[in-house]
Amino acid sequence: MTDRNFSPQQGQGPQESLPEGPQPSTMIQREEMNMPRQYSEQQQLQENEGEGENTRLPVSEEEFRMVQELQAIQAGHDQANLPPSGRGSLEGEDNGNSDGADGEMDEDDEEYDVFRNVGQGLVGHYKEIMIRYWQELINEIESTNEPGSEHQDDFKSHSLPFARIRKVMKTDEDVKMISAEAPIIFAKACEIFITELTMRAWCVAERNKRRTLQKADIAEALQKSDMFDFLIDVVPRRPLPQ
């Protein structure tokens, strides 16, 4: 027989409560645990990518910024007017023409600089005589004491006295000592200067149909070229005859 007052709840033993689902607190904790892990992984990936970029492009930040600016400027220009191939050919032709013109100008400048003042103040065959003198003089200086050359010089004897040259050099208070080569060079320079000035004065005398070289001829020769302006205190300037 059964007891009518029997309650099914009384006959059943204690039942354990089954978790219906994850509690909110546990979900928050798991998310908090996963976030640092994900963040560390992302940070590591970014560092690896940065190291890879640095190994591929070993440039500084300033250079990288300049490259970006140049790319932006190039992207903003309109390239439709002239194709790159045509532009390259035109630039090549222009560069070739300019190089050729520059080469010709350089050669002309060199020739002009060498004999720029040689014929200054002279005309006709007088100018040709002076240019020929300087050409022969340059060739002689370059070939002196060379093997097989006819121009040999021991630099021990000159037309001008070395003692007089040393005395003139010592008039400068800043000159304390004079080497053995200095008077030789000064003597050669003085010899060239006197020879050229004599030739210029002779051109003046011959033009005036005279055979005697006078002081007026030297003064007139000095006035015809600005190379001799340093002698203005020695030889006063006079009006040139018409």
Curated annotation (Swiss-Prot):
One of its GO terms (biological process) is regulation of carbohydrate metabolic process. InterPro entries: Histone-fold, Histone_H2A/H2B/H3, Transcr_DNA_Rep_Reg. The modification Phosphoserine is found at S7. Signal peptide: none annotated. Its main location: nucleus. One of its GO terms (molecular function) is protein heterodimerization activity. Keywords: Activator, DNA-binding, Nucleus, Phosphoprotein, Transcription, Transcription regulation. It comes from the Eukaryota. The keyword Oxidoreductase does not apply. CDD domains: HFD_NFYC-like. GO terms for cellular component: CCAAT-binding factor complex; nucleus. SUPFAM superfamilies: Histone-fold. It is found in: Nucleus. Residues 1-108 are annotated as: Disordered. Residues 1-15 have a biased composition (Polar residues). Residues 91-108 have a biased composition (Acidic residues). Belongs to the NFYC/HAP5 subunit family. Acts a component of the CCAT-binding factor, which is a transcriptional activator and binds to the upstream activation site (UAS2) of the CYC1 gene and other genes involved in mitochondrial electron transport and activates their expression. Recognizes the sequence 5'-CCAAT-3'. HAP5 is essential for DNA-binding activity. It may be the linchpin that binds to the subunit association domains (SAD) of HAP2 and HAP3 to bring these proteins together. Component of the CCAT-binding factor (CBF or HAP complex II), which consists of one copy each of HAP2, HAP3, HAP4 and HAP5. The assembly of the HAP2-HAP3-HAP5 heteromer (HAP complex I) occurs in a one-step pathway and its binding to DNA is a prerequisite for the association of HAP4. Present with 450 molecules/cell in log phase SD medium. This is Transcriptional activator HAP5. It comes from Saccharomyces cerevisiae (strain ATCC 204508 / S288c) (Baker's yeast). The gene is HAP5.
